[in-house]
């Protein structure tokens, strides 16, 4: 009897040891979310949060299906639209073990986080911010973007303006932007591309977001009856700028084009309809007819809650790439994950999609390089780790809703 008990105990102990060993071999990954819950781009926070959660849940399911020993969880923090708060948020997520950080949406926040936290620790950042100012720092290969940078968005805005006006040649575009890196860089790139096409530029008119009113700037923007307005702003300040433009009595929103920070599914109630109805704009596009998008959208609709928002597919892709890189590295070490991003986005390697994510995980687990194509499309990272793909939506606000008119390749 005692011998039987000892045998049973030994067997149980052996099973426990085997279980612990198997558990120890599993890569436990933490993906951090730097969310704009409050601040000038708070409209983006809920959809980014949801996108990363869905990516983590789906990747975990596919890893289990593939028999690959990796599981992930997501943790989040509010960056508050402020670089100092963003650094504190990033530190808290890294302290919780985050190997990758998805977000933030504002470039000065990303720069502060990189300089203050992530470069030293080799933690990968996947920001939603598009400003080229991000590439003025030496990030040691730790900052990847799945969103097209503003060097490409400027070309998209030019194409959208030509689509509206028929030509750029001789046409006057009045450029007005919020005084911060996103506005400054995009205005500069647009102006250069517009004049290269034979167009003329008025301004740019620059405004401080802390101003109480923008009547003076609005008057400057509408002077000389321009053929088009190029407005680069955030929702909180456009509520005031838009009202000031309407007060001039000269502003026609159907002549205006905006960039991605003013792209939202439903127009916020504090923006006057007369300031936005009929306005067009550009944002990074997602090919909605693909099987990958159908899976993504099905997950989104099943989860309920917030509607799709600009760049939610890009945040989903960022989390998926972090997961794949960790699987390829067989490690959640931030440096190892960072070093394997290009191993899962290798041009010329076998292509995998969201529809074949389980197979992709098997491939990287066996040491193969792959070219993962995201929901938002291919990445084909340049030397500076920005995507070279350039699909953009051209949209128009109709009865308070964003309606996509067409999709374009900004480089053509």
Task: Place the predicted regions along the sequence by residue.
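Sec/Tat signal peptide C-region and signal peptidase I cleavage site
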Residues: 17-24
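Hydrophobic helical h-region of N-terminal Sec-dependent signal peptides
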Residues: 7-17
């Amino acid at each position: 009897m005692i011998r039987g008990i000892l045998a049973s105990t030994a067997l149980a102990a052996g099973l426990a040891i085997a279980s612990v060993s198997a558990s120890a071999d599993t890569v436990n990954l933490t993906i951090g979310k730097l969310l704009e819950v409050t601040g000038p781009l708070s409209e983006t926070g809920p959809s980014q949060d949801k996108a990363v959660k869905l990516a983590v849940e789906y990747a975990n399911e596919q890893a289990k299906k593939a028999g690959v020993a990796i599981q992930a969880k997501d943790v989040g923090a509010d960056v508050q639209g402020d670089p100092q708060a963003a650094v504190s948020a990033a530190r808290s997520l890294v302290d919780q073990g985050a190997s990758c950080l998805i977000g933030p949406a504002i470039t000065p926040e990303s720069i502060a986080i990189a300089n203050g936290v992530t470069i030293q620790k080799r933690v990968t950042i996947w920001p939603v911010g598009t400003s080229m100012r991000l590439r003025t720092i030496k990030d040691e290969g730790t900052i990847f973007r799945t969103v097209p940078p503003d060097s490409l968005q400027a070309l998209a805005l030019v194409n959208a303006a030509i689509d509206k006006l028929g030509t750029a040649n001789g046409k006057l575009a009045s450029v007005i932007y919020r005084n911060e890196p996103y506005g400054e860089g995009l205005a500069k790139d647009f102006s250069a591309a517009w004049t290269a096409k034979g167009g003329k530029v008025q301004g740019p008119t620059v405004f401080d977001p802390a101003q109480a009113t923008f009547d003076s700037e609005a008057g400057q923007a509408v002077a000389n009856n321009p053929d088009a307005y190029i407005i680069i702003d955030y929702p909180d300040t456009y509520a005031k700028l838009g009202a000031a433009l309407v007060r001039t009595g000269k502003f026609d929103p159907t002549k205006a084009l905006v960039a991605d920070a003013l792209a939202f599914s439903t127009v916020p109630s504090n923006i006057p309809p007369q300031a936005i109805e009929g306005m067009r704009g550009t944002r990074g596009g997602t090919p909605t007819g693909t099987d990958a998008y159908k899976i993504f959208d099905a997950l989104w609709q099943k989860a309920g809650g917030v509607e799709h928002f600009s760049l939610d597919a890009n945040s989903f892709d960022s989390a998926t790439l972090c997961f794949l890189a960790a699987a390829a590295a067989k490690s959640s070490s931030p440096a190892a994950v960072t070093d394997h991003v290009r191993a899962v986005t290798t041009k010329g390697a076998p292509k995998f999609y969201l529809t074949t994510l389980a197979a992709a995980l098997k491939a990287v687990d066996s040491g193969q390089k792959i070219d993962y194509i995201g929901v938002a499309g291919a990445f084909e990272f340049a030397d500076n780790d920005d995507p070279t793909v350039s699909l953009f939506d051209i949209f128009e606000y109709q009865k308070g809703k964003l309606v996509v008119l067409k999709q374009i390749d900004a480089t053509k």
